[in-house]
Design a protein with these regions (language model features):
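Acidic/histidine-enriched, beta-strand-rich ligand/metal-binding domains
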Residues: 1-10, 14-74
Length: 74
């Protein structure tokens, strides 16, 4: 069975954890202000790009927040 959910702790002033589900291409971002957002239909290369980015917050604002539909979970 293939692992479809990847969860990673993140060193960032914006987020502390992130998850990616490769079955439905959803990305969960856990923000330091205790908000949790689920972004829909995020291609895998954005998930990988997040970890290559020198600033996670800038990457999220530029490539995730304005491009993908989302829901606030908390």
């Amino acid at each position: 069975m293939t692992n479809t959910l990847e969860s990673v702790m993140v060193e960032s002033s914006s987020i502390y954890s992130a998850e990616y589900n490769s079955v439905d291409n959803t990305m969960l971002l856990y923000f330091n202000n205790e908000s949790i957002y689920r972004y829909h239909k995020v291609p895998l290369f954005y998930w990988r790009g997040l970890f290559d980015a020198s600033s996670k917050g800038k990457f999220i604002n530029k490539f995730i927040v304005k491009k993908f539909s989302f829901e606030k979970l908390s």
